[in-house]
């Protein structure tokens, strides 16, 4: 499924089953108006002070309140055109109309590069081309030019991760999402509480609502959804965690997008 965010939806087959053949057909673009999304992330320093989003920021995700350009910069001069690290980075998100937008920028090391496109949401970034390191040479941050919040990280942990690790997403305009799977894991045998939060931005002053609440101790847990949750266009999704001791936690979710 490679990138798994914005699969082209072309074809003429009508879906008729719920087994693995159906999900494979969606991934192969066999169904008109259907696409799949796989989101996953990690929070390396979960604590007990309050819920945090499962992303590299180790905090609640700072959801933007308006559309803005983005500033992209690395901690290493090697992440640059002609460098040994990341040379180009693709950013994926939503524009002012909540439609999917992507932009590929050429890195300039420790000097910030500003996008030409404006973004209302950012839900993934990845290294597209790289030098001899075959990934990023240091942490790359993507920051809102207006609110100055870091909205995405491409992490570096001995080696570059090559893309963001963030279990947050927003349903694009003209789509409806159906959540079919959740998974969570933690690094310590201590109590972790996970909650799956959504916010419908079609509603003025929309509140966050919890759709799933799970407790787990050390290891991996997965839930295949049969009573499937529905998320309408412009809905924010945020997988969050809290722990009774400092630990790392990861998690993700899968959903099917269907054209309205």
Indicate where each model-derived feature is located.
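A signal for long, low-complexity, Ser/Thr/Asn-enriched, surface-exposed stalk/shaft
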Residues: 1-5
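Beta-strand-centric surfaces of beta-sandwich/beta-rich domains
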Residues: 8-11, 15-121, 129-260
């Amino acid at each position: 499924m490679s990138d798994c965010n914005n699969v082209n939806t072309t074809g003429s087959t009508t879906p008729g089953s719920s087994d693995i053949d159906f999900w494979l057909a969606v991934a192969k673009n066999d169904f008109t108006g259907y696409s799949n999304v796989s989101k996953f992330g990690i929070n390396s320093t979960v604590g007990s002070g309050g819920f945090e989003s499962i992303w590299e920021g180790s905090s609640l995700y700072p959801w933007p309140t308006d559309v803005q350009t983005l500033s992209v910069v690395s901690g290493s001069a090697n992440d640059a055109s002609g460098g040994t690290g990341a040379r180009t980075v693709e950013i994926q998100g939503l524009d002012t109309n909540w439609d999917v937008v992507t932009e590929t920028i050429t890195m300039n090391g420790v000097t910030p590069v500003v996008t030409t496109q404006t973004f209302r949401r950012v839900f993934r970034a990845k290294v597209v081309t790289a030098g001899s390191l075959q990934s990023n040479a240091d942490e790359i941050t993507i920051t809102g030019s207006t609110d100055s919040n870091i909205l995405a990280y491409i992490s570096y942990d001995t080696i570059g991760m090559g893309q963001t690790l963030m279990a947050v997403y927003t349903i694009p305009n003209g789509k409806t999402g159906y959540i079919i799977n959740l998974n969570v894991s933690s690094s310590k045998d201590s109590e972790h509480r996970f909650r799956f939060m959504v916010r419908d931005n079609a509603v003025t002053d929309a509140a966050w609502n919890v759709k799933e609440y799970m407790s787990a101790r050390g290891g991996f847990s997965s839930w295949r959804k049969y009573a499937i949750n529905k998320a309408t266009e412009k809905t924010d999704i945020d997988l969050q965690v809290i722990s009774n001791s400092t630990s790392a936690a990861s998690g993700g979710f899968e959903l099917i997008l269907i054209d309205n």
